[in-house]
Amino acid sequence: MSKVCEYYFAPQSPWAYLGHTRFVSLAKQHGVQIDIKPCDLGKVFNVSGGLPLAKRAPQRQAYRLVEMKRWSDHLQVPLNLQPKFFPLPGDPAAKLIIATKLAHGNDAALEVAGAVMRALWAEDKNIGDTDALAAIASACGHD
């Protein structure tokens, strides 16, 4: 029986971005198949008591930036702490990732997910824009 890990994440999450490459690498190293499943953090917040970033106390917002910088440095993953196009809904990016999974499989979807998150958090691109997403998919070799 093969090992499968269901990977729930939000494409616009800085934490998903920071951990994505390491997670995929660890799964491959240990023979674990990843079943990629983008999700809507807004719906998770509504049922779990979490707060969207804009509704958090200023102190928590500031500490979030400190932690993101610390983890970015520790993992040596480039990260723009305040990207031009954040916050934004993750639905368009999630739909691209799901479409890639259905058309080309999990590995292709994992590649596209990494590229989407890198585009937002390291390249200052708008992953809510369909033209930007089409360019990301094309750069990954998908139409």
Where are these regions (language model features)?
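Extreme N-terminal starter segment of soluble prokaryotic enzymes
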Residues: M1-E6
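Structural alpha/beta surface segment adjacent to cysteine/selenocysteine redox centers
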Residues: P11, Y17-E123
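Helical "substrate-binding/catalytic lid" subdomain
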Residues: K125-I127
